[in-house]
Amino acid sequence: MTLTVSPQESAHQQDESVTPRTYEVRTYGCQMNVHDSERMAGLLERSGLVKAEGKVADVVVFNTCAVRENADNKLYGNLGMLAPAKEANPGMQIAVGGCLAQKDRDTILKRAPWVDVVFGTHNVGALPTLLERARHNEEAQLEILESLDVFPSTLPTKRDAVYSGWVSISVGCNNTCTFCIVPSLRGKEKDRRPGDILAEIQALVEDGAIEVTLLGQNVNSYGVEFGDRQAFSKLLRACGEIEGLERVRFTSPHPAAFTEDVIEAMAETHNVMPQLHMPLQSGSDKVLKDMRRSYRSSKFLGILDKVRTQIPDAAISTDIIVGFPGETEEDFQATLDVVAKSRFATAFTFQYSKRPGTPAADLPDQLPKAVVQERFERLTALQDQISAEENARQIGREVELMVTAGSGKKAAETQRLSGRAKDSRLVHFAVPEGEETPRPGDLVTVTITEAASFHLVADPLPGSVYRLRRSRAGDAWDLAQAEFCGVPNGAQGTSDGGKSSVSLGMPTIPVLPAR
């Protein structure tokens, strides 16, 4: 499409070269959305926009989730809050993308007519063009594709953490879980070629990253498109050959396709972390059948046994849905039993949310809210107890942490920084008097001194250790700080030197006094 630019518009663009337009990307949902949001930010920056600092941006992009009903409410609530700002500033633009946009393509502009652009999961790369077209034509642009336009990982990226990165190995899903709307929104599975994935990882490492997380709706089915059933385990082993890559994680696998070659690759590849997220969803075989999950509780528990045999210190997390249609008290008790046997480090528990367009939405015996709530509270109480007990076992252990730019809510009060252990447990730690303060991306070895359900603490006590290993990732963080404000800024802000361009609601690392 060719646009004719008037002299007035040309002058307007020249003004913008002096004062660039600002943007913000607000992200809801899963890690795949975080990955896509980083691409949206990269596209906007390549188009000349800069991230907003402290006030409403000229361009606000919502990258949405459609898994839960409250995602709809959150989006429309936030759009409503922006309406006065849009009315006061006609040049402001609002874009809505992601899974909810793919699903509600015909609804968003009706419910929020002040939105300028609606785009889907398959055409992230079109965002700058759609924004410019909406501005030029002075009318909203709706563009939803039914198949992938460009693989998102090939798009420009503005990463929020120079020390780690998300790497998508596939998009879409071939499973047909009755509660899930994602396959209808992201399509059938499409796999990237191994060489492209490894090249992206190598580029991340060369930019300073020491950790990557491999992403897919079902990572262990990777290779189905090119007929290699062991492609994922081979990919993990290939990651082990990349010099400078210290930590490899992945999410999420599916129990039905989780094979022993993957467990062996995890155990035998030095930089694959002792962490596994394995979605259970329900401990009831009847409910699993109704969910169309294609495994049963005995297979699930068998996977955990095999993982713990080969990786004894593995921390295993899960997803669980409470209140699926037709779930009886007996079914729910089966879930509690599997949770008790599994000893998850943590669990992401959800109350079943009826999603129009999914087979489960039409099932009989939808449960009353009060029943679901009561079961949910029993499940979370059990898992919180297990998490606290499993974390208590870490007290006295020496663990290596990668320092993160996010910190705990009480960081300013406690003077603690935060990091992730190899098994992904969150640890808040204090720097001993006289020791050097680490940067995000540096690695510290500490002794765990306290434990709670959701985090660990490492404070300087007699007999405890504190060892700092400065890393390339920390150097990259310093460089990003210098590029943003002229000089490195100690341990403050996000990886790119200021407010995150991709908003996740994460706290920033505190400023510690000189030691």
From Swiss-Prot:
Cysteine disulfide partners in this protein: none
Keywords: 4Fe-4S, Cytoplasm, Iron, Iron-sulfur, Metal-binding, S-adenosyl-L-methionine, Transferase, tRNA processing
Cofactor-binding details, from the entry: Binds 2 [4Fe-4S] clusters. One cluster is coordinated with 3 cysteines and an exchangeable S-adenosyl-L-methionine.
EC class (word): transferase
Signal keyword on record: no
Binding site for [4Fe-4S] cluster 1: C30, C65, C99
Stretches the record annotates as Disordered: 1-22, 490-515
InterPro entries: Elp3/MiaA/NifB-like_rSAM, Methylthiotransferase, Methylthiotransferase_CS, Methylthiotransferase_N, Methylthiotransferase_N_sf, MiaB_methiolase, rSAM, rSAM_horseshoe
Biased amino acid composition, Polar residues: 1-20, 491-503
Ranges for domain Radical SAM core: 159-389
Localization per record: Cytoplasm
Residues of the TRAM domain: 392-462
Swiss-Prot/TrEMBL cofactor(s): [4Fe-4S] cluster
SUPFAM superfamilies: Radical SAM enzymes
Chain sites annotated for binding [4Fe-4S] cluster 2: C173, C177, C180
GO CC annotations on file: cytosol
Record's keyword annotation contains Hydrolase: no
CDD domains on file: Radical_SAM
MTTase N-terminal domain residues: 21-136
Family under the similarity heading: Belongs to the methylthiotransferase family. MiaB subfamily.
NCBIfam families to which the protein is assigned, alphabetical: miaB-methiolase (TIGR01574), MiaB/RimO family radical SAM methylthiotransferase (TIGR00089)
PANTHER family (alphabetical): CDK5 REGULATORY SUBUNIT-ASSOCIATED PROTEIN 1, MITOCHONDRIAL TRNA METHYLTHIOTRANSFERASE CDK5RAP1
Assembly notes: Monomer.
HAMAP family: tRNA_metthiotr_MiaB (MF_01864)
Record protein name field: tRNA-2-methylthio-N(6)-dimethylallyladenosine synthase
